[in-house]
Amino acid sequence: MLNWAIDGFWGYSVSEVVLYLLVVTHITIVSVTVYLHRFSAHRSILLGPVIAHFFRFWLWLTTGQVTREWTAVHRKHHAECESLDDPHSPVKQGLPKILWNGVEVYKSAIADEETLSRYGKGCPED
């Protein structure tokens, strides 16, 4: 453990590890914003197959995110915004629940096959 503190993780310095983590995190955030949100959920941009596949693969690799599930939950959120049927409404479910139990809220939403079939149309089957 002392060697890691002195030599860094696999021989990389702390600043190199931090830089790597920042770059990987940024690519993941851009992938969610561009691919899942703009391209898949709202269809507000067009992406070529190569870049779409890159984003899809990156999200699978870094988050395990399934495109159809994320898209369906997001579309339902817009369709049922701030109602009892909104899958992640901080107004109806409370902000602390969404912030601290967001994964459980999301898993509950994707467990509903009707949500996936109704709002996940046009998405790839990951």
Where are the regions a protein language model picked out?
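Non-catalytic, topology-defining segments of multipass membrane proteins
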Residues: 1-126
